[in-house]
Curated annotation (Swiss-Prot):
Pfam families: MTTB
Catalysed transformations (reactions): Co(I)-[trimethylamine-specific corrinoid protein] + trimethylamine + H(+) = methyl-Co(III)-[trimethylamine-specific corrinoid protein] + dimethylamine
Similarity annotation: Belongs to the trimethylamine methyltransferase family.
TM annotation in the entry: none
Name this protein carries in UniProt: Trimethylamine methyltransferase MttB
Keywords per UniProt: Methyltransferase, Pyrrolysine, Transferase
One of the GO biological process terms: methanogenesis
This enzyme's EC code(s): 2.1.1.250
GO molecular function, one term: trimethylamine methyltransferase activity
Length: 496
């Protein structure tokens, strides 16, 4: 008989519990038809000459002078149909494989930060290559992070070779599936070569892609050259590409959230059309980091209720198209791991999980997605566990209704010693960090708050956790690719 399960990893079981409808069928259809109208009559600006030619040969109306591509309805709908509805994102260790699609819910860390709060000194500083390694290793230890996104940008590495340094460090420090920003076709080929070495060859990598790429259309309604290169090369290699639009309502998209979803949808579907025209059936994710423009502070807040609303809406659009989704949720605007940070993570993380988003990214980052903090990462991991538990819902079966047990205990009894209780007690949520004890026990343990406990646990993980290592020969191959790339760009050797 069916039983509740806690700590469900993305892809292990489909989350079918509590949910959020968000839109009526008529409203989803209205967003869809509005999108088709804009794509066909306004179009997208595409910088890449190769992409323009692919669109033209595929049947789109292309103005090579203005670089505007107008995409007819049938091409959009053909692309939606040919893109896979389910993706298996492989980990270096198959136990870490995850499945995206339907309403499976998973979490992943936020990425691309440029600063960090040191867990020992609480110093605020710029990020380094060593930080990329340490945070990746830390995320590998987080049991509720279902994959790993490049967490921060190393400020001590020359920008032209940062991508290969990131890839080397990440492949060495996690056996989960990884998302790596490659920033163009040339770097994509380098990372592909590295991933093939890890996988045991390009054929094996195509069968089990160990990494995915993120590309960001430029709102409103543009796809720049390096993004097109990654879409095209990813499609040819069978590597999943996440079409991650980053519109800002009121600035780079309409002030109304429905209007923002239209431009967002245009950008993502346009990128998917390019992918499918390049290679039919190429793996893609329907992505989003879209939010609002805070008109008072002139910022793009990631902890706003509107971010949760927009990205829950994006999850529903992805389900409407039967495409795997990746959405922003759980990131925070607070500068330190405080009550504001916890409220913001829970608000947007819960909204997007209830909507059935497949991968929700935002964990571990403060300051509008700029600053990584280890305590925040641990606290977010705990909240992700609770959110997964909550959205799993309540199983209603003969076993869980427990009528026979209730009748046996009768009035004024208790259920503590019942076999039924022992059989199901492990389905209750538990947490190492969240305090549920009585005050006297809390005082005896040092009267520490959530953040203090998280920093202590973070330091313990940093000092004691070791990820599954790469074989020495493969690690040496990755190092040689990094050095080869440094030579090609004329960059001096970077210290490891």
């Amino acid at each position: 008989m069916a039983r509740l399960r806690s700590m469900v990893q993305a892809g292990v079981a489909r989350v079918e519990g509590f949910g959020l409808a968000g839109f009526s069928d008529e409203e989803l259809y209205a967003i869809h038809t509005s999108t088709l109208e804009v794509l066909e009559y306004t179009g997208l600006k595409i910088e890449s000459q190769e992409a323009l030619e692919i669109f033209s040969e595929g049947g789109a109306r292309v103005d090579f002078k203005t670089k505007v591509v107008k995409i007819p309805q049938y091409l959009v709908e053909d692309a939606i149909q040919s893109a896979p509805s389910t993706l298996v994102l492989a980990g270096r260790n198959p136990k870490n494989d995850i499945v995206l699609g339907g309403k499976r819910v998973g979490f992943i860390n936020f990425g691309e930060g440029v600063s960090i709060i040191d867990p020992y000194t609480k110093e605020y500083r710029k990020t380094t290559r060593r930080d990329v390694a340490n945070i990746t290793r830390f995320c590998d230890a987080m049991d509720q992070m279902d994959a790993v996104l490049r967490p921060v940008a190393p400020q001590d590495i020359h920008p032209s070779v940062a991508v290969v340094h990131n890839a080397e460090v990440i492949f060495n420090n996690t056996s989960k599936h990884v998302f790596i920003g490659v920033e163009g076709g040339r770097n994509f080929k380098k990372v592909l070569k590295m991933a093939a070495a890890v996988a045991g060859g390009e054929d094996k990598l195509r069968e089990r892609p160990l990494f995915s790429c993120n590309i960001c259309p430029t709102s409103p309604l543009q796809i720049v050259n390096h993004a097109s290169e990654v879409i095209i090369e990813g499609a040819r290699a069978g590597i999943p590409v996440n079409m991650l639009s980053m519109g800002m309502s009121g600035a780079t998209s309409a002030i109304t959230l429905a209007g923002t979803l239209v431009t967002h949808n245009c950008e993502v579907l346009g990128a998917i059309v390019l992918s499918q025209l390049t290679s039919k059936g190429a793996p893609v994710l329907y992505g989003s980091s879209t939010t609002i423009m805070d008109m008072k502070n002139m910022t793009a807040p990631v902890g706003s209720p509107e971010l949760g609303m927009i990205n829950a809406g994006v999850a529903k659009l992805a389900q409407y198209y039967n495409l795997p989704s990746w959405v922003a949720g759980g990131o925070v605007d607070s500068k330190i791991p405080d009550a504001q940070a916890s409220h913001e993570f829970t608000l947007t993380g819960f909204l997007t999980a209830l909507a059935g988003a497949n991968l929700i990214y935002g964990a571990g980052m403060l300051e509008l997605g700029i600053t990584f903090d280890y305590a925040q990462m641990l606290m977010d991991n705990e909240m992700a566990r609770m959110i997964k538990k909550a959205v799993g819902g309540i199983s209603v079966t003969d076993e869980t209704l427990a009528v026979d047990v209730i009748k046996s205990v009768g009035t004024a009894g208790n259920f503590i010693s019942e076999d039924h209780t022992y059989a199901h007690m492990r389905t209750q949520s538990q947490s190492k960090l969240v305090d549920r004890s009585m005050r006297e026990n809390w005082l005896a343990a040092g009267a520490k708050d959530f953040t203090q406990r998280a920093y202590e646990e973070a330091i313990s993980i940093l000092e004691n956790y070791t990820p599954e290592p790469l074989p020495e020969k493969i690690a040496a191959t990755l190092r040689s690719i990094v050095e080869e790339t440094e030579d090609e760009y004329g960059v001096a050797r970077s210290l490891i």
